[in-house]
Amino acid sequence: MNDTTHKTLEVEVLNIHKGEYLSEALKRQGYPMLPSNAIINKVMTGTGATYMELNPKLSPRNSIVIEPYRSAVENKVQAFDEVQGVFKEVTVKKLTAYLNNSNIKYKKIITTPEGFQTKVLKAAKSLKMNIYKEFFNLYDKSEHITEDTDYRR
């Protein structure tokens, strides 16, 4: 029998006022950025969680955002100048050059799960980067990733 320790997440309810963005609600309640090791069940779309993480003024840290679909990656790349999208056309070499670009203080990568596995991890390995320590990772729309992998309880 597998003796695994089960951990539970502490539930904390944070309220978003009508017309308020998630970044504003979090800051009002003591969180300067999206918290680590948390599941945010924000129920409604368009509150700005991904925008907050991809904006270096709102989230001054290196970030990797994983989207379930390429179309979401494409749409969000268009909204930010210094965000590196990972598509079929983006090579590991190009991604490595982005990660080495000293003119970009906070690296922001947006990718699909496949791009993360086949390109982001390879680029990080080639640079001897520990992206698990050097980057914040946001799984956007994680419910889609779970559904698409046919998760069963």
Q: Language-model segments: which ranges?
A:
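Conserved helicase ATPase motor motifs in RecA-like P-loop NTPase domains
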Residues: I40-Y51, R70, K141-T149, R153
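Signature of the SF2 helicase/ATPase Hel1-core->accessory helical subdomain module
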Residues: G115-R153
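Pre-Walker A adenine-sensing motif
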Residues: D3-P35, L54
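Conserved Walker A/P-loop ATP-binding site and its immediately adjacent core
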Residues: T45, A49-T91, E114-T118
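Structural recognition of the conserved hydrophobic beta-strand(s) that form the central parallel beta-sheet
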Residues: V65-I66, K108-T112, L138
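A general structural signal for short secondary-structure junctions and capping/turn motifs
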Residues: Y31, N55-K57, Y98-N103
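Inter-Walker segment of RecA-like/P-loop motor cores
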Residues: D81-I131
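Pre-Walker A (Motif I) flank of P-loop NTPase domains
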Residues: P32-N41, P60-N62, K107
